[in-house]
Amino acid sequence: MPLRPIIILPDKRLRLVARPVASVDSEVRALMDDMLETMYEAPGIGLAATQIAVDRRVIVLDVAKRRDDSAKADPICLANPEILWASEELSSYEEGCLSIPEFYEEVFRPEKVRVGYLDRDGRRREIEADGLLATCLQHEIDHLNGVLFIDHISRLKRARIIKKFEKAAKLDAQEPKRAPHSPHTDAQKPGAASDL
């Protein structure tokens, strides 16, 4: 299970709408395993395939387990997830994203959701969620639709964040390339922000 590099804003691939999975086969299960390993290593609590530049509607989450936590891992792998129902009541959570490291903003989303998806065995399932799990599901499904959490904040704050990442990308492009044996990409530096 290799670690996959996580793409960072302003990478335009983050804005693409992912294609559905035709069936959950060994290739999709291997992708899910790679995504879980990448998410745990980052560390994060959710990851969408689009964040590792894979054009498939696949997300993985584990809100119970965080790096250096004593909690037992309880991962959820979802192919073709879709929100079937969302409550009118909203709740807020300070969200972060592995593709937008070190930035956190309060985002309002439906407090409860019901999501339909295919599990690792290709069976159709539904999950009802509230709290952090509901927030995480919505955040990751947004990624599959080319939507980032910063799209849910004010235009001024969003523009400031995008400008900062565009400037950093230009500076990175001007710097000499890292040695190929470097153990970390920018997205996987120790202490990187957790993804919701």
Curated annotation (Swiss-Prot):
Covalent S-S links between cysteines: none
Cross-referenced CDD domains: Pep_deformylase
Cofactor note: Binds 1 Fe(2+) ion.
Binding sites annotated in the UniProt record for Fe cation: C97, H139, H143
Coiled coil: none
Keywords: Hydrolase, Iron, Metal-binding, Protein biosynthesis
Record-linked Pfam families: Pep_deformylase (PF01327)
Cofactors: Fe(2+)
Family of the protein in this entry: Belongs to the polypeptide deformylase family.
Name of the protein in question: Peptide deformylase
